[in-house]
C-alpha cells in the first residue's frame, strides 16, 4: 500500500523538486554493505565494503554481554544464547554467515579507523534491563573516545531511554531516534539531532520531513531498498536513506 501511494504521488507530479546532490553523501549502508560475495551483515568486511563504494556511512548494531564485552550483532541472541545474559566466552567462537567471528566493538572501531572519514552509524540495541543499556552506552562511549572516533560516530536507537542517556552523557554527540512515535518538535525538545524513521512513518506524516528541517533536525529513512521509493524520499528532501542497496542508491 505504501508503495502504491508513492507511485501515485509520482504520477500526480506532487513530489517536491530537489536540487541535484551528491547522492553518495546521503546513503547509509544498513548493517554495512553485506550484499556482496564473501560478506555478512555487521561484519568487518561489510564495513570495509561500505568504505570502498564511497557512501556517507555504515550502520551497525551493538549489545553488551553480562561480563561487559560490547559486540557488533543485530539480533539479541546468537544461536539461542541471549547476549545480554551471556558471558563473552559463550559466544566468542560463533561465526557469521561468511565465517567471520562476531566482532567486538573494539575490533570494529580499529578497522573503522583505517577507513578515511566514513561515518559510523551506531545503533544501541534495546536491552531487557535499562541498566544494561546504560552499561552498553558507557562502554561504547569510552571505546569510541579512546579510538579517536567521536567526530565520526553518530548514535541511533529505538530505546528512548538509550537516546536520552547518550544526550545526557555525551551532549556533543549526534543522536537520532528510531521508534517513530515522536513528532519532530518532540524530538527537538528531547535534545536529539534528528529523526530516523521507518518509511511508513513519513508516509503517515507527510509534513514531518519539512517540519524537521525547519527545526534544524536531520532526517533519515529506513530500510528502503526499492529504487523508486528511494528516489521518492530524495525528492522529498530527506537527508539520508538507510538501505541494503547502497551502491544502487548512490547511483540515483
Regions inferred by a protein language model and the residue ranges of each:
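Bacterial Sec-dependent N-terminal signal peptides
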Residues: 1-24
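Phosphate-group recognition and catalysis centered on beta-loop-alpha active-site segments
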Residues: 16-252
Amino acid at each position: 500500500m505504501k508503495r502504491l501511494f508513492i507511485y501515485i504521488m509520482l504520477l500526480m507530479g506532487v513530489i517536491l523538486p530537489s536540487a541535484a546532490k551528491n547522492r553518495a553523501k546521503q546513503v547509509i549502508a544498513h548493517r554495512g554493505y553485506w550484499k556482496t560475495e564473501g560478506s555478512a551483515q555487521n561484519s568487518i568486511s561489510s564495513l570495509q565494503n561500505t568504505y570502498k563504494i564511497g557512501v556517507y556511512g555504515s550502520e551497525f548494531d551493538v549489545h553488551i554481554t553480562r561480563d561487559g564485552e560490547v559486540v557488533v550483532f543485530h539480533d539479541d541472541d546468537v544461536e539461542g544464547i541471549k547476549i545480554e545474559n551471556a558471558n563473552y566466552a559463550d559466544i566468542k567462537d560463533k561465526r557469521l554467515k561468511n565465517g567471520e567471528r562476531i566482532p567486538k566493538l573494539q575490533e570494529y572501531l580499529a578497522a573503522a579507523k583505517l577507513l578515511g572519514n566514513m561515518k559510523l552509524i551506531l545503533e544501541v540495541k534495546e536491552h531487557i534491563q535499562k541498566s544494561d543499556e546504560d552499561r552498553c552506552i558507557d562502554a561504547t562511549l569510552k571505546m569510541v573516545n579512546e579510538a579517536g572516533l567521536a567526530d565520526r560516530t553518530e548514535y541511533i536507537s529505538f530505546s528512548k531511554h538509550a537516546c536520552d542517556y547518550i544526550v545526557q552523557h555525551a551532549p556533543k554527540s549526534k543522536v537520532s531516534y528510531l521508534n517513530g512515535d515522536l513528532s519532530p518538535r518532540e524530538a527537538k525538545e528531547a535534545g536529539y539531532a534528528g529523526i530516523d524513521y521507518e518509511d511508513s512513518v513519513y508516509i503517515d506524516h507527510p509534513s514531518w520531513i519539512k517540519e524537521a528541517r525547519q527545526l534544524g533536525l536531520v532526517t533519515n529513512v529506513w530500510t528502503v531498498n526499492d529504487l523508486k521509493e528511494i528516489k521518492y524520499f530524495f525528492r522529498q528532501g530527506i537527508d539520508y536513506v538507510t538501505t541494503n542497496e547502497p551502491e544502487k542508491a548512490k547511483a540515483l
